[in-house]
A protein has these predicted regions:
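Acidic, glycine-rich A-domain
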Residues: 1-166
Length: 166
């Protein structure tokens, strides 16, 4: 994912598009963290690249709050289009989620619907850990891709961005 973020960041910077690269982790609903590696106002420079490269996986994957926070930040940005691309290598899971329920998937869907009301659109990219049925709940209207090989992400992500924004 880091390599893909670096490639996309370089491409967006060369296009002159404003962008943010963030990450998130959680340990229960009261302990959600959102990390900013490159914010909208920062230049894409050596420091931004270093922060992306220093990112490490941590704790659990409570995606709904991260989407809401991304939407909150993006809502304040003047842009012709506002897009959130979520890249995940696993199912949404956290303490407090019943693994037999689809609560996490429905929370992501609700966060996407909340952002859509603000004219912010989301696209999800996942490994095969999520099924088509899971992804259709989280990212309705086929606004998702499932990659059988995450190593293809650096090649696919720039093409996807162009498709979503043109």
């Amino acid at each position: 994912e880091k390599h893909a973020a670096l490639i996309l960041g370089q491409g967006l910077a060369s296009l002159g598009d404003r962008f943010e690269i963030g990450g998130f982790s959680s340990n229960g609903h009261e302990n959600c963290h959102y990390f900013i590696y490159k914010d909208f106002e920062q230049e894409w420079d050596r420091q931004s690249i270093t922060r992306v490269l220093a990112a490490t996986p941590a704790e659990s994957t409570r995606i709904g709050p991260a989407l809401r926070h991304s939407g909150y930040r993006l809502e304040r940005i003047e842009a012709r289009q506002r897009l959130i691309i979520v890249v995940t290598d696993g199912k949404p899971m956290d303490s407090g989620y019943d693994p037999n329920s689809r609560y996490a998937q429905h929370d992501i869907r609700m966060a996407n619907e909340e952002n859509a009301r603000l004219d912010i659109h989301t696209f999800g990219i996942s490994t095969e850990a999520n099924t088509v049925a899971d992804m259709e709940i989280m990212f309705p209207r086929r606004r998702f891709a499932i990659l059988p090989d995450i190593r293809k992400l650096p090649r696919i992500l720039p093409q996807l961005y162009i498709r979503l924004t043109v």
